[in-house]
């Protein structure tokens, strides 16, 4: 196996019906089996070939993670094209340079990319339009002859403001690492991998896409990095492994520890952590079983790479009974060079080279690498390529050593490159060039200033020409930089000049030593207003930033003034949700957001209501068996006596496979049991019905009774209906069909009432067959306002199923469904 096309075809043949990709975003659910994925990738390749992509042509891919991103990526590769993936946070200036270098024939973008950032010189297709384009054009895929040595990707290692370098990776580079990883990492067809990291980066592609696909695992993509969302998905999906960077590991651990503190169990937590290292892993999992329940109960191990991992943080996770498998690599090695394995790992190291991977240590301590995973050079940059290789060895620019057991110890970087805790690379010279253009600044040196927990921040040390306006100069410069390049703090250098070498280069290590010895580099901020929301927020911001509350004001920029990077902001938003019951997503924050901006957002957002509880027990085996028994011996005979039922249109159910959304008019309390009786033979007990939360579930005893008899769940008729809709998505995702009454309440006279708009939203976003049902006669048997039924005939008419097109207007969808019921 030498190409991604061969790998994907083999996976489709071996694991065809298994789930390959899945993502839930709001009420939209995307799922693809391996067979679906192979077919969609081929169709996409044909579409791209129709749009002018030939073998070796470059295609820009600029979008957030999603199954559509994966399909587009694979479509380019199996069609013979070369993918140029871009980070969603790339600046327009950087993208323009990449476009100029690679000359792509097409750009595949998400509509979420700001319009001002898009390049007008390249034809654009939007990933959101991909399903529609595939249906409309029905392109025929022409299989090109692809070899292992053919170029697969040109990856630009993060955004730089200088001349970016494109790393050329072949199909064989990618496949070799995937094959090697399969021997080292225990992923199999029963694994469920959660992919959080941006797929525009090679580590995420390896650990969150290619490696799981090669093993037949299921990959779950997540649109949010907030711990609350992450933990919900871990529980709901039964996730077995996650690939993370150290900062995300710390983010989740901090979330867990805050919960421990709120429960008043901090002393017990510390005692258990002191005890755990002496115990076997199985016993540790029992000791921390409550944490494992919170993490879904299925987590087997975590993968960590992309940046330095503090051994003390790794030990915390190991103490929980969750192994941390570290690795070392970079874009130029198609992700991985060394690996930990489940049974051979050593804290403080980054693993061992697998068989076939050559690692040497140069006399000066530099790590040298050779193997089939090493890139072939930089795109159209022979000089940079030549400087990177020495006698066939790739010079990593990293320092380290191999111990007697072959474990690699990473000691630091030989070059000036800054690697942030989220795995993003920052080139100091690029930021320095921008800062040095400002008239207020004589010269700037950008360094990685150490913070607590082994983290670093991008910090500028400045020789000033205009001390009064230096802060404004830094702020203005930040507007030109990508989010990971932001200067998080700065220091005015007190001397006349920086320490320099005899060739006048700044001695960065001496500058860093001076800063490390100083006690504090901060200026006073304006006082915080006394409103409670501001006071609460100031406390939480101070906690995340590690600063005194009095140093934080409404004009404090979260990045520049407080040193918060993107993941620190995610942690802050998580803390706000936990402590203030207000949910804010990253996307709601403006660029260069200040504390005042966040205060304004919080003031406009309603506090979260108590979450609606949807118990799992009605879907359990015991409840389902009891339900079938009660329906057959009690409910069905009673209905047969009260309302002899004629059923029309059963043939419309024959061609429906999988879950469906049943919609019916609502005239009586008997509507649900009658419909369930009609559908029982075909759908058994895998059918759930919505019932008015305020009517049936206000009394717990009554709510539990109808949950048992009819597998009913509460649906809010007033207020926030979103939790209920998300529960419906959960049911459909698990293969259940759902019955709802779109009128929202019983008709007082038997006439069809206008439908609530939510049914259109559900029908469009779920993407499953919608089956209309017309009930006649029940209004005479048990009308609204009566509890004493009268015997009478009933007719149930089942209409033909329909699927609503993705992207259809919800109001129009609702109107169409109402018309379907009226026609019956």
Task: Enumerate the language-model features and the residues they cover.
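Non-catalytic C-terminal accessory region of glycerolipid acyltransferases
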Residues: 470, 516, 722-824
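Conserved AMP-binding/adenylation subdomain of ANL enzymes
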Residues: 175-192, 199-289
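Conserved ATP-dependent adenylate/AMP-binding module captured primarily in the ANL superfamily
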Residues: 88-116, 133-137, 177-194, 226-240
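Conserved pre-ATP/AMP-binding loop-to-beta segment of ANL
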Residues: 16-19, 138-156, 163, 186-192
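Conserved AMP-binding/adenylate-forming
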Residues: 242, 283-408, 414-417, 431-432, ...
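Conserved C-terminal "lid"/linker of ANL adenylate-forming enzymes
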Residues: 445-448, 478-530
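AMP-binding/adenylate-forming catalytic core of the ANL superfamily
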Residues: 90, 107, 361, 371, ...
């Amino acid at each position: 196996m030498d190409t991604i096309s061969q790998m994907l075809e083999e996976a489709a043949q071996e694991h065809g019906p298994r789930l390959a990709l899945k993502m839930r975003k709001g009420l939209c659910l995307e799922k693809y089996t391996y067979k679906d994925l192979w077919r969609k990738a081929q169709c996409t390749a044909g579409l791209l070939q129709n749009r002018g992509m030939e073998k070796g042509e470059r295609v820009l891919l600029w979008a957030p993670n999603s199954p559509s991103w994966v399909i587009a990526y694979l479509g380019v590769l199996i069609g013979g094209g070369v993918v140029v993936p871009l980070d969603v946070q790339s600046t327009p200036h950087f993208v323009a340079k990449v476009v100029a270098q690679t000359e792509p024939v097409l750009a595949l973008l998400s509509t979420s990319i700001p319009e001002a950032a898009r390049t007008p010189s390249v034809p654009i297709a939007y990933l959101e339009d991909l399903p529609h384009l595939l249906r409309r054009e029905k392109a025929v895929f022409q299989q090109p002859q692809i070899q292992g040595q053919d170029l697969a990707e040109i990856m630009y290692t993060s955004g730089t403001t200088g001349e970016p370098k494109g790393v050329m990776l072949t199909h064989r580079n990618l496949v070799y690492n995937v094959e090697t990883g399969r021997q080292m990492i225990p992923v199999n067809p029963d694994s469920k991998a959660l992919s959080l990291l941006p797929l525009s980066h090679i580590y995420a592609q390896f650990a969150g896409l290619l490696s799981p696909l090669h093993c037949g695992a299921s990959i779950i993509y997540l649109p949010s990095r907030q711990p609350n969302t992450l933990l919900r998905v871990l529980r709901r999906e039964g996730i077995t492994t996650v690939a993370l960077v150290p900062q995300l590991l710390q983010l989740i651990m901090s979330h867990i520890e805050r919960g421990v503190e709120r429960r008043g169990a901090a002393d017990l937590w510390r005692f258990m952590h002191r005890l755990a290292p002496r115990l076997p892993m199985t016993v540790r999992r029992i000791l921390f079983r409550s944490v494992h329940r919170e993490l879904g109960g299925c987590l087997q191990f975590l993968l960590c790479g992309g940046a330095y991992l503090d051994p003390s943080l790794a030990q915390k996770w190991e103490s929980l009974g969750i192994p941390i498998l570290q690795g070392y690599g970079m874009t130029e090695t198609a992700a991985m060079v060394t690996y930990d394995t489940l049974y051979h790992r050593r804290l403080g190291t980054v693993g061992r080279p697998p068989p076939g991977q050559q690692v040497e240590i140069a006399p000066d301590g530099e790590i040298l690498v050779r193997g089939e995973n090493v890139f072939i050079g930089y795109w159209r940059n022979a000089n940079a390529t030549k400087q990177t290789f020495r006698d066939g060895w790739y010079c990593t620019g990293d320092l380290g050593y191999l111990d007697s057991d072959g474990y690699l110890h990473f000691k630091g970087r030989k070059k000036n490159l800054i690697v942030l805790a989220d795995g993003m690379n920052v080139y100091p010279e690029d930021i320095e060039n921008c800062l040095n253009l400002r008239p207020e600044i004589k010269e700037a040196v950008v360094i990685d200033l150490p913070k607590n927990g082994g983290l670093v921040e991008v910090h500028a040390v400045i020789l000033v020409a205009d001390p009064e306006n230096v802060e404004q100069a830094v702020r203005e410069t930040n507007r030109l930089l990508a989010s990971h390049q932001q200067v998080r703090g700065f220091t005015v250098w007190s001397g006349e000049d920086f320490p320099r070498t005899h060739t006048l280069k700044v001695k960065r290590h001496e500058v860093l030593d001076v800063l490390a010895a100083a006690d504090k580099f901060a200026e006073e901020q304006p006082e915080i207003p006394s409103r409670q929301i501001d006071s609460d927020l100031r406390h939480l911001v101070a906690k995340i930033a590690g600063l005194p509350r009095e140093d934080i004001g409404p004009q404090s920029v979260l990045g520049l003034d407080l040193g918060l990077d993107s993941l620190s902001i995610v942690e802050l938003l998580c803390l706000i949700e936990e402590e203030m019951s207000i949910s804010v997503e990253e996307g709601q924050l403006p660029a260069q957001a200040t504390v005042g901006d966040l205060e304004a957002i919080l003031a406009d957002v309603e506090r979260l209501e108590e979450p609606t509880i949807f118990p799992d027990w009605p879907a359990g085996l015991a409840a389902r068996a009891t339900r079938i028994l009660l329906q057959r011996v009690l409910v069905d005979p009673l209905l047969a006596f009260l309302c002899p039922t004629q059923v029309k249109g059963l043939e419309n159910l024959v061609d429906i496979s999988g879950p469906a959304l049943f919609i019916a008019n609502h005239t009586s309390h008997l509507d649900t049991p009658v419909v369930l009786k009609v559908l029982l033979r075909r759908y058994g007990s895998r059918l759930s019905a919505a019932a008015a939360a305020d009517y049936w579930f206000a009394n717990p005893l009554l709510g539990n009774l109808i949950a048992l008899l009819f597998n009913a769940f509460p649906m809010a008729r007033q207020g926030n209906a979103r939790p209920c809709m998300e529960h419906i998505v959960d049911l459909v995702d698990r293969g259940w069909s759902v019955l709802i009454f779109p009128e929202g309440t019983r008709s007082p006279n038997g006439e069809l009432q206008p439908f609530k708009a939510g049914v259109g939203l559900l029908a469009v976003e779920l993407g499953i067959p919608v089956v209309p049902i017309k009930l006649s006669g029940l209004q005479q048997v048990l009308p609204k306002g009566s509890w004493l039924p009268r015997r009478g005939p009933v007719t149930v008419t089942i209409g033909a199923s329909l699927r609503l097109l993705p992207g259809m207007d919800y109001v129009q969808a609702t109107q169409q469904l109402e018309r379907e019921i009226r026609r019956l």
